């Protein structure tokens, strides 16, 4: 303002309008702008209008430029997404260049470019479309689980988790499989189950499967049961290589061939009955009486014989039987075992390391089963050779048979009259107890474990 102007003219100056500060583009200039520049222009104009409204402290109508920009943005966004949907996935975001497999993912992503419509978490920085989703997310940081089940007292962060949990108590399974008819509680469980039926084709009863031994040209045919279903491609022998680099050598004679049948008996259980090994190849006696369930298919086939297994670990354990020298081999008695733990348990018999000691007598055993059989001997044979009566009484107390008095050293107790069998009192009873041992009645406070 000039110094000579009167002071009263300040109150009659025209207020600043939006058109005075707005930047306008012609149609040719607007067409030259890319998507990011258009978004930046819209944000600047919207922020300018907000600042002007806050300074004026009065309600101002939206200018034509702001209304036009908002309408054009919505129209541009719809046309871009429509073009992408007609062309098919991936759906492309023209703002940042990201691609999405579904249109819903693209819609959710477009809210990130508009800060006015996003709700960000102050702890992890994640963005959400609605404040409700943000409040559910904050419960995870705070540890709040307000939704509680009245039947089992389990708590959940949101109502959807509680509703899914209630299906367990109600037995509600709305999702059913169209192939086998099984029903599930969630859609995710159904999709996980449907993967079992994928690539499973029924095999005719007269169809044969050709198997080849790796490293050789030998091939043989093996029939496949009608109820068995095999996944195409898994019957190829390439998925089961031999555990050693050299070619397998089959046993036909010697001590190792005699122990081969015992090795196969200790292998993992299979769904088919195994026949004894004769010659160089194993034969499989299959039984068609019980159909195979689709969820328990034997898809891992042995390249040396016609056996099939449901797990790859069972197949690798079975292939050890075809090797010349099994890994779990005892050098003392030439016995072979399917696992290393059984070999260690067997070698204790040679090393005389009997770690299971009887607490009553001085006998020791190499296996736990032997000690348990020794403890149960009070009803059968007299396995405890040191003290018959002492061993029987203590074992009876341990096993809960203290009221049953066994025969001691061939002496028979007569029931009836004044003669009665001696009473055995456990040391857990308090006070002085009247003990009886071989007819001698004494009063003592010591335990029956020390009485002889």
Curated annotation (Swiss-Prot):
GO terms for molecular function: chromatin binding; DNA-binding transcription factor activity, RNA polymerase II-specific; RNA polymerase II transcription regulatory region sequence-specific DNA binding; zinc ion binding. Gene3D superfamilies: 6.10.140.140, Classic Zinc Finger (3.30.160.60). SMART domains: KRAB, ZnF_C2H2. A zinc finger (C2H2-type) spans 91-113, 119-141, 147-169, 175-197, 300-322, 328-350, 356-378. InterPro entries: KRAB (IPR001909), KRAB_dom_sf (IPR036051), Znf_C2H2_sf (IPR036236), Znf_C2H2_type (IPR013087). CDD domains: KRAB_A-box (cd07765). Keywords: Developmental protein, Diabetes mellitus, Disease variant, DNA-binding, Metal-binding, Nucleus, Repeat, Repressor, Transcription, Transcription regulation, Zinc, Zinc-finger. Transcription regulator required to maintain maternal and paternal gene imprinting, a process by which gene expression is restricted in a parent of origin-specific manner by epigenetic modification of genomic DNA and chromatin, including DNA methylation. Acts by controlling DNA methylation during the earliest multicellular stages of development at multiple imprinting control regions (ICRs). Acts together with ZNF445, but ZNF445 seems to be the major factor in human early embryonic imprinting maintenance. In contrast, in mice, ZFP57 plays the predominant role in imprinting maintenance. It is found in: Nucleus. Residues 433-444 have a biased composition (Basic and acidic residues). The record marks 185 as: Crucial for 5-methylcytosine recognition. This is Zinc finger protein 57 homolog. Its main location: nucleus. It comes from Homo sapiens (Human). Residues 410-452 are annotated as: Disordered. GO terms for biological process: autosome genomic imprinting; regulation of transcription by RNA polymerase II. Belongs to the krueppel C2H2-type zinc-finger protein family. ZFP57 subfamily. It is linked to Diabetes mellitus, transient neonatal, 1: An autosomal dominant form of diabetes mellitus defined by the onset of mild-to-severe hyperglycemia within the first month of life. In about half of the neonates, diabetes is transient and resolves at a median age of 3 months, whereas the rest have a permanent form of diabetes. SUPFAM superfamilies: beta-beta-alpha zinc fingers, KRAB domain (Kruppel-associated box). One of its GO terms (cellular component) is nucleus. The KRAB domain is required for function as transcriptional repressor. Zinc fingers 3 and 4 mediate recognition of the target element, ZF3 interacting with the 5' half (TGC) and ZF4 interacting with the 3' half (CGC). Residues 16-88 form the KRAB domain.
